[in-house]
Amino acid sequence: PSSTLPRSSAASDVYKRQLLLMFSITLAQSEDLTKLGTFKDWNAVSVFNETGKICFAYSVPVRQSPKASNREARLFVSFRPEDKITDEVSITSGYDFNPQNAILATSGKSKFEFDLPQNKFAWISSGKTEQKIIKRMKKASRLMITAYKQSGTQTTDDYSLMGFTKAYNAAKKSCT
C-alpha cells in the first residue's frame, strides 16, 4: 500500500485506534455511512470524517467456531486517500487478541499472517503481503481466519469471498 507512515510506527498505531473508534461509531450510526453496494456476501461503503473520505469493502463470517460465540467478526479492505493508504487489509474477531499467538488467514495452500494486532483489530504490516492476500481473495471462494482470545481459546471465522472483487472495486473506485 501507499503510506506516508510505516504501519508499525507509533503515529500509525494512534491513527488505527482512532479509525477503530470511528468505525465502531459509524457502524452504530449507520445513517452516516454511504452504502456503495451489496455484492453477494460482501458490502462496500464510504464515510467522511475529519480527515477525509474512507472507503472499505467488508464481510461477516458465514461460519464461526466455537459455534456459540456472539462475536462481531469482520474482514475489511480499506482505502484512505487523505492518508495515501490503499488496500489495507484488517480484521476484527470481536475480542482482544492474544498477542502470544499468530493470527492467520488461510485460503487453499496460501497462508497470511496479521502481524499487527491491537486490541480487537489486526492488520498486515507488509504492503506486499496485502497485495498477495487481495489477489488470493479475488480468485478464491473462501478465507479462514484463525486467532486466539486472551484466554487462549482458538476461534475460526470462515468468510465467503463471493462478491469480494465487486465490493473491492466499488470501494476502490469511490476513494480514487
Language model segments and positions:
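Single conserved hydrophobic/aromatic residue that forms the stacking wall/gate
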Residues: 1-18
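N-terminal signal peptide c-region/cleavage motif recognized by signal peptidases
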Residues: 23-27
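A generic "folded-domain core" signal
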Residues: 29-176
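Extended interaction regions within the primary functional domain
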Residues: 8, 28-29
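Residues at the start of alpha-helices and the adjacent loop-to-helix junctions
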Residues: 3, 20-22, 47, 159
